[in-house]
From Swiss-Prot:
It comes from Pongo abelii. One of its GO terms (molecular function) is dolichyl pyrophosphate Man9GlcNAc2 alpha-1,3-glucosyltransferase activity. It is found in: Endoplasmic reticulum membrane. The gene is ALG6. Keywords: Endoplasmic reticulum, Glycoprotein, Glycosyltransferase, Membrane, Transferase, Transmembrane, Transmembrane helix. Coiled coil: none annotated. This is Dolichyl pyrophosphate Man9GlcNAc2 alpha-1,3-glucosyltransferase. GO terms for cellular component: endoplasmic reticulum membrane. It is an enzyme of class 2 (transferase). Residues 25-114, 165-172, 248-297, 345-361, 409-437, 495-507 are lumenal. Residues 1-3, 136-143, 194-226, 319-323, 383-387, 459-473 are cytoplasmic. The chain crosses the membrane at residues 4-24, 115-135, 144-164, 173-193, 227-247, 298-318, 324-344, 362-382, 388-408, 438-458, 474-494.
Length: 507
């Protein structure tokens, strides 16, 4: 009884922080003609309510795709339509065709913020609570502390409740998928993850680990018996869920193709804006976006992404385990973020979710990563006038992690899950006994650099000849950190010889 009382308090704390952040500015507030993501979400409500389904993804006089045209899968459009019906009931002016463009008011802001909170309450927060309650071999106190830290992760709060998006929906469905598969409810887990992909196509970052883990399970059961039956059932679930989600758009071939063109805009190029991945960082030294033809950029990004995630995926197929599954989710999502085509700065949230899931296992490294992930979005958050909420929520999250997990005491090779790797290295370099000390120093350097760059960005004006200097530095420093984490998580995956035994049921 006490556990549920404390968990309720944790949820209320998470909701309070979310609503407090929502009182601040949002993307594109008072900035015509394009405004920002807030207007994009409102505009999608306008389009889905006033136009027939067949026109949602097509350019027309009533639906200018250059002005925040729909570029997410059908379930996102259905969600917008549902919100539009509620908006119509409250104030029809909010979704009036054409005349509502750029609509802003305190009442409308309250409505929009409430839709995010309701989605969070229905999908993401219950998944977090259940996940933490299902963790094995840790105390009730640690389960509650884990839930608190996950719910206080500033990156997701600042983007959904500050900038304005509905990332908690797709991430929540993905988490339900992780829960289902980790508890051997493979069909329900697969259904939940299909809903995640069909809500936001960026959930493809997590698709390979789901596929490899389930395939490994099928191999383990035997493809001539129970494994084959499971494989057929999984295939039926995937096909059925996609057909149901896309049914209105399967009536005509051109409808399906147009939606796909909107979901995967290859014409936009390798990257947009300032994002903390390899291509944007490397572009500072060599303008690969201008030098290489677009099809070469596409092939290059595919090759780098595929090669970087291959070892983890092979290991997961050969040795399927819940622990390996979660770490492979981190590794694959990070590979996609660093090397894939058309990455946005907010896509780092797709890496942050699985990192949150291993917070209780490697608290020091997880906390560090989640701090860097929030810092990597600094240029976007400053543009949205969210500096103060960013600082306060980041400090609150850091304090929660330090007090809950004593992270500075969890830096030994064993706590960092690097003991097997260190033993292997010491066979050739007996003097290699300082790995944990190196990581502590790297953490210190990383945090100091992030603090200094934040202060410089806020207090100093960039040189006239280099107006994007601080934004580029933020991306470059974040990218270096992410490369280090990619190596680290792959080391854990490859050198983990106990993934199939002595593991926790969920964690």
């Amino acid at each position: 009884m006490e556990k549920w009382y404390l968990m309720t308090v944790v949820v209320l704390i998470g909701l309070t922080v979310r609503w407090t952040v929502s009182l601040n500015s949002y993307s594109g507030a008072g900035k015509p003609p394009m405004f920002g993501d807030y207007e994009a979400q409102r505009h999608w409500q306008e389009i889905t309510f006033n136009l027939p389904v067949k026109q949602w993804y097509f350019n027309s006089s009533d639906n200018n795709l250059q002005y925040w045209g729909l570029d997410y899968p059908p379930p996102t459009a259905y969600h917008s339509l549902l919100c539009a019906y509620v908006a119509k009931f409250i104030n029809p002016d909010w979704i009036a065709l054409h005349t509502s463009r750029g609509y802003e008011s305190q009442a409308h802001k309250l409505f929009m913020r409430t839709t995010v909170l309701i989605a969070d309450l229905l999908i993401y927060i219950p998944a977090v609570v259940l996940y933490c309650c299902c963790l094995k071999e840790i105390s009730t106190k640690k389960k509650i502390a884990n839930a608190l830290c996950i719910l206080l992760y500033p990156g997701l709060i600042l983007i959904d409740y500050g900038h304005f998006q509905y990332n908690s929906v797709s991430l929540g469905f993905a988490l339900w998928g992780v829960l289902g598969i980790s508890c051997d409810c493979d069909l329900l887990g697969s259904l939940a993850f299909c809903l995640a992909i069909n809500y936001k196509q960026m959930e493809l970052y997590h698709a390979l680990p789901f596929f490899c883990f389930l395939l490994g399970k099928c191999f383990k059961k035997g493809l001539k018996g129970k494994g084959f039956v499971l494989l057929v059932k999984l295939a039926c679930i995937v096909v059925a869920s996609f057909v149901l989600c896309w049914l209105p758009f399967f009536t005509e071939r051109e409808q399906t193709l147009q939606v796909l063109r909107r979901l995967f805009p290859v014409d936009r190029g390798l990257f947009e804006d300032k994002v903390a991945n390899i291509w944007c960082s490397f572009n500072v030294f060599l303008k690969i976006k201008d030098i290489l033809p677009r099809h070469i950029q596409l092939i290059m990004s595919f090759c780098f992404t595929f090669l970087s995630l291959l070892p983890a995926c092979i290991k997961l197929i050969l040795q399927p385990s819940s622990k390996g599954f979660k770490f492979t989710l981190v590794s694959c999502a990070l590979s996609f973020f660093l090397f894939s085509f058309q990455v946005h700065e907010k896509s780092i949230l797709l890496v942050s979710l699985p990192v949150c899931l291993v917070l209780s296992e490697i608290p020091f490294m997880s906390t560090w990563f989640l701090l860097v992930s929030t810092f990597s979005m600094l240029p976007l958050l400053l543009k949205d006038e969210l500096l103060m909420p960013s600082v306060v929520t980041t400090m609150a999250f850091f304090i929660a992690c330090v007090t809950s997990f004593s992270i500075f005491e969890k830096t030994s090779e064993e706590e960092l899950q690097l003991k097997s790797f260190s033993i292997s290295v010491r066979k050739y370099l007996p003097c290699f006994t300082f790995l944990s000390r190196i990581i502590q120093y790297l953490f210190l350097i990383s945090v100091i650099t992030m603090v200094l760059l934040t202060l410089m960005t806020v207090t100093l004006g960039p040189p006239q000849k280099l107006p994007d200097l601080f934004s580029v530095l933020v991306c470059f420093v974040s990218c270096l950190n992410f490369l280090f984490f990619l190596v680290y998580f792959n080391i854990i995956i490859v050198w983990d010889s106990k993934s199939g035994r002595n593991q926790k049921k969920i964690s």
